[in-house]
Amino acid sequence: MNLLPANPHGNGLLYAGFNQDHGCFACGMENGFRVYNADPLKEKEKQEFPEGGVGHVEMLFRCNYLALVGGGKKPKYPPNKVMIWDDLKKKTVIEIEFSTEVKAVKLRRDRIVVVLDSMIKVFTFTHNPHQLHVFETCYNPKGLCVLCPNSNNSLLAFPGTHTGHVQIVDLANTEKPPVDIPAHEGILSCIALNLQGTRIATASEKGTLIRIFDTSSGHLIQELRRGSQAANIYCINFNQDASLICVSSDHGTVHIFAAEDPKRNKQSSLASASFLPKYFSSKWSFSKFQVPSGSPCICAFGTEPNAVLAICADGSYYKFLFNQKGECSRDVYAQFLEMTDDKL
């Protein structure tokens, strides 16, 4: 969740994002960065830079390396540089410079992936990074890109050169033709891979439909309806076994869908009437909850299989529990920016 150029809540938060298994989340601030355990909520690291802001923080599971990009009113680093921070040494150990602004960074143990506004560059994760690949994309100001963290699967997915298309490449075998998925007619707003790299979920700027595809064949597996009105999708995430997905939007709601068992999702009683528009046969979320503040948020599943977390731009943290019937209740509320190690 990128809150640049300005977070309307005035709390100094510029960026929030989960690590690869959603066990932690990192925040870029106007004065440094912070790392939290996601569930249970606990501040793990607070690095203050009195002289500058961090607009992007990318973790690598729970290891000591983080990718930082400067941002905010007084960026700590130039926004066209990726800095790899070693949290044991408390300093940057790798620096990669580009001719244009960095939109996002993705990490796996052997690769650094840097997203620019119309291309993606892949480097070795070594002390002197070596450029391996360059992939063209359509104009990609949001820096959309997902990298499978699984050691047995090196898939990288990003917007293709055609509007609404997703391209999937295997970094372990770039001779293999990429999988090209015409996911949506409109511009992509969000993409997400499951941990195993077998499924990809997509949404367009219209934000009414979420589509799930098989990454090896590109075949559509499920089409899910978030709502009938257009929405800006902030986040999509799978749970650990890819049986569920959660979706957050600017309508202040987080929806939970069954990704593997479509019978769990709600459907109109008119769904079987062949003469009615496709809308009536849509599969709707089986559970949803409202984020009380309505603030932009990212979402992921918690440590319990029936828990969903929401990390919000106003500094609020919510944990909701849902049951088989789809009923939802709030379990935890906290203000994560106001936490310190002493309070926990």
Curated annotation (Swiss-Prot):
Residues in WD repeats: 183-223, 228-267
Keywords: Autophagy, Lipid-binding, Lysosome, Repeat, WD repeat
Subcellular location field: Preautophagosomal structure; Lysosome
GO biological process: autophagosome assembly; autophagy of mitochondrion; cellular response to starvation; glycophagy; nucleophagy; pexophagy; protein localization to phagophore assembly site
Cellular component GO terms held in the UniProt record: cytosol; lysosome; phagophore assembly site; phagophore assembly site membrane
Pfam family, one: PROPPIN
Short motif (L/FRRG motif): ranges: 224-227
InterPro entries: PROPPIN, WD40/YVTN_repeat-like_dom_sf, WD40_repeat_dom_sf, WD40_rpt
Primary location recorded for the protein, binned into one broad class: other
One GO molecular-function entry: phosphatidylinositol-3-phosphate binding
Gene3D superfamilies on file: YVTN repeat-like/Quinoprotein amine dehydrogenase (2.130.10.10)
Top-level division of the source organism's lineage: Eukaryota
Keyword Repeat carried by entry: yes
Function comment: Component of the autophagy machinery that controls the major intracellular degradation process by which cytoplasmic materials are packaged into autophagosomes and delivered to lysosomes for degradation. Binds phosphatidylinositol 3-phosphate (PtdIns3P), and other phosphoinositides including PtdIns(3,5)P2, forming on membranes of the endoplasmic reticulum upon activation of the upstream ULK1 and PI3 kinases and is recruited at phagophore assembly sites where it regulates the elongation of nascent phagophores downstream of WIPI2.
PANTHER family, alphabetized: WD-REPEAT PROTEIN INTERACTING WITH PHOSPHOINOSIDES WIPI -RELATED
Family indicated by similarity: Belongs to the WD repeat PROPPIN family.
UniProt remark on domains: The L/FRRG motif is required for recruitment to PtdIns3P.
Name under which the protein is recorded: WD repeat domain phosphoinositide-interacting protein 3
Gene: WDR45B
